[in-house]
Amino acid sequence: MRPSAEVRHPGLLLLAAVLLVAANLRSTISGVGPLLTQISADLGIAEAALGLLAAIPLIAFAAVSPLAHSLGMRFGFSGVVLCSLIALGAGTVWRSLPGAPLNLWAGTVLIGASIAVANVLLPAVIKREFSDRLAVVTALFTAFLSGTGALASGVVVPVSQVPGGEGVLGWRGALLFSGALIPLATVIWLVAMVRSREARAWATPAPDAGTPRAGPPGTAAPAVEPQQAPHGRWGVWGDAVAWQVLSYMGFQAMAFYMMVTWLAPLAHSLGRPEVVAGIDVMLLQVSSLAGSLSVPLMLRGTLARWTPALIPVLGLVAVTGLIAVPLLFPGWVILYGLSSGASLAMSFSLFGLRARTPGAAGRLSGMAQSGGYAIAAVGPVAFGGLLSLTGGWLAPLLLVELTLAAQLAAGLFVGRERQVLTASAPAGRS
């Protein structure tokens, strides 16, 4: 019997599944910012206090990320990701249920925990299955993530105004709509598990010490790693390179979530209508697509060593422009989007580039996302606190600039070709 197309080209089906999962990792949370005004008015909660709502997924990321790799190793990556998609759908529905505000908060917690699992496991899957095309597939992954987040940001306000029931759909209906792709992603992921020739290997946890999926000659990591250092008592948490990746991940995420949460209220305060303010957030994330897709090109050039440090420079220019020349608001938003998209793609690329094996990539991903999102969770709350304390936007935007400067500093170190859990830090070239 001749193998089916899915069997002969399992990588295509797996790639489609990975990208569809990525399409759900930001859309369910990026729509919150443009709806803060509606949520505040409906629930009677101060808009600045709702910065905590944006921080809850990040806190969940920090708490759950260290567990995700262990769950994948124990139960299989594909099964755990499937469960996370089901939980993501349940959390999205729960968050939109009418009644007590508890539904909003508890549903958001479940959403954050579900996204955290997929965030950690997918980079390890990409490292194993696409080791010869790591930068390109990672860029596509982050582009889908950013693109659907952009779409959600731009449509939630118009959707909230669509007639439905006794009035309009409102913010609850709009947030429910933000999870529209979850059922499709769940089905395609399940189909990929069942029909791919690689289903059994895909469902098996990534090896700890070094049997990544074979690729073209010279592309896969070695099966035996003579430079592999003992993991020691602290494992990846005791590795300096891992802490550099964590810092870079954390500062870029902190800056992004401050901006994506508060950009719409900032635009509204400058006299831009609510719908236009939501489109501004969409514009930020649409422009981040170009930033994400540019990273593979930058990593091939002579400036690859300095790419992590150069990316946040664009963000610094953009935020300075928002402060000094707000009349050019859309232009600064686009520039910041380019920086944020490239920052995210760079961060996810580092999980693979700074690890020799899929197992090491999974541990690095879990550690960096746990600590990184713990840093990021401070951002939206601190931004809202400064806004309430000072009554203006200057101090909060200066906090964003300080965060981007910290990302730049981390980028100076993480750009060096060194890998985690190795006796000799430099990665070297063969």
Task: Outline where the language-model segments fall.
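Conserved MFS/SLC helix-loop-helix module at the cytosolic interface between two early adjacent transmembrane helices
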Residues: 63-102
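Helix-breaking motifs and short loop linkers at transmembrane-helix boundaries and internal kinks
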Residues: 44, 76, 97-102, 131, ...
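Extracytoplasmic gate region of multi-pass secondary transporters
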Residues: 32-33, 240-292
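A late C-terminal transmembrane helix in Major Facilitator Superfamily
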Residues: 358-400
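Helix-loop-helix hairpin linking two adjacent transmembrane segments in secondary transporters
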Residues: 100, 132-197
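Cytoplasmic helix-loop-helix junction between adjacent transmembrane helices
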Residues: 107-143
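Primarily marks hydrophobic transmembrane alpha-helices of the MFS/SLC 12-helix fold
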Residues: 78-81, 305-309
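Helix-to-loop junctions at the C-terminal end of transmembrane segments
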Residues: 64-76, 291-304
